[in-house]
Curated annotation (Swiss-Prot):
Organism: Streptococcus thermophilus (strain ATCC BAA-250 / LMG 18311)
GO CC terms, sorted: cytosol
Pfam family, one: RuvX
Subcellular location per the Swiss-Prot or TrEMBL entry: Cytoplasm
Role summary: Could be a nuclease involved in processing of the 5'-end of pre-16S rRNA.
Protein name stated in the entry: Putative pre-16S rRNA nuclease
BP-aspect Gene Ontology terms: rRNA 5'-end processing
Keywords: Cytoplasm, Hydrolase, Nuclease, Ribosome biogenesis
UniProt family annotation: Belongs to the YqgF nuclease family.
SMART domains documented for this protein: YqgFc
PANTHER family the UniProt entry points to: POLYNUCLEOTIDYL TRANSFERASE, RIBONUCLEASE H-LIKE SUPERFAMILY PROTEIN
GO molecular function: nuclease activity
Length: 139
């Protein structure tokens, strides 16, 4: 079963995909979106769903450290509802607290990536971490 992980932000959606057996996650790409213009990248997402033969989505939920839900959680859930409607595939949610911090730390400490380059890959890596955490929890 192929699972697609999404890190939904206000300007981008980081995309990751699982291997066919659902054990490992790898980052795929970052889709630019514009919430104010109602451009959410669904066309590109559809292309990736077909290419990877996706069976399920996992959307990261950016909860606060005290486990409360802020406005970005609402936006992520709305995105999840919309992709469920468009693609007719199940959507699960994964707590994504600290995944962006973890991704940033990995890029700085392990890969020594410059700040400019980090901005180009951080959301994709965060999506990969969200999906891997989900897969680890499920299997």
């Amino acid at each position: 079963m192929r699972v697609m992980g999404l890190d939904v932000g206000s300007k981008t959606v980081g995309v990751a995909i699982s291997d066919p057996l659902g054990f490992t996650a790898q980052g795929v790409e970052i889709i630019k979106i514009n919430e104010e213009a109602k451009e959410f990248g669904f066309d590109r997402l559809g292309e990736l769903v077909k290419e990877y033969q996706v069976d399920k989505f996992v959307v990261g939920l950016p909860k606060n450290m005290n486990n409360t839900e802020g406005p970005r959680v609402e936006a992520s859930k709305a995105y999840g509802d919309k992709i469920k409607e468009i693609f007719n595939l199940p959507v699960d949610y994964q707590d994504e607290r600290l995944t962006t911090v973890q991704a940033e730390r990995m890029l700085v400490e392990q890969a020594d990536v410059s700040r400019g380059k980090r901005k180009k890959v951080i959301d994709k890596l965060a999506a990969q971490l969200i999906l891997q955490n989900y897969l680890d929890r499920m299997f």
